[in-house]
């Protein structure tokens, strides 16, 4: 019996989704004849082994709408809330399935390249994958498959953006000055995630954001459809109140990380990174910031 129904069941229990499956043989052949293609250059086969027959890519839909932010609080992109929520559900189930040897959870393979090749979606000029069903509001994972299943053909169309450049114009730091390519050194989200020193000119542009930006996604016409699911919950002021992270005495910063991790996941609730971003947010809130 095919493994796909088991994968589909887990996906359906997690969130509205789209699944595409492509043969490794097809991927290898495409890469061989498209060596100069940027997508080809991102793809490597380090996680693929000789027994693996193909890859299934799952796109889980999420709601990009933000709740109202209470005064004195910092915000997060809904992406991180839903990514953490979905991971908690699907990961233990997929781990059980992986023990059977029928799938492998891929962790380092370039998801955007696989998503485009599989037909999950097209590249936007903001370098994010989108489709007609979910826009760019989805979270992706990839699974290596170890049996023959019903495969999808390769998608050979990179983008459907045409002359639109709304996302490029919306970026406050011009990080999208080259279509389809993100300049990480000018991306607000990149600094939020890494915790490296933020250039002074970018600090006020971060306003109240702890993690995530989404400005380029909010203007994308592909995201104009109403989401199929409810937005993330209202902000918990006990978790997102900025003063809690700035006060000395009482709870330490490490004490505050577990409640925050319930919202954004442990990877993004790291004390050193959060502290750096909180300092910026605190100053922006105090000064009024720049919208």
Positions of PLM-derived features:
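Iron-sulfur cluster-binding cysteine motifs and their immediate structural context
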Residues: 166-189, 206-236
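Core register positions within helices of long alpha-helical scaffolds
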Residues: 277, 281-284
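Auxiliary alpha/beta "docking" domains used to position bulky ligands
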Residues: 1-160
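Acidic, Ser/Thr- and Gly/Pro-rich intrinsically disordered linkers and low-complexity segments
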Residues: 253-269
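Immediate flanking context of iron-sulfur cluster ligation sites
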Residues: 152-162, 203-213
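Active-site-proximal loop/short-helix segments
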Residues: 176-199, 233-253
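Short, Lys/Arg-enriched N-terminal segments with co-localized hydrophobic residues
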Residues: 288-289
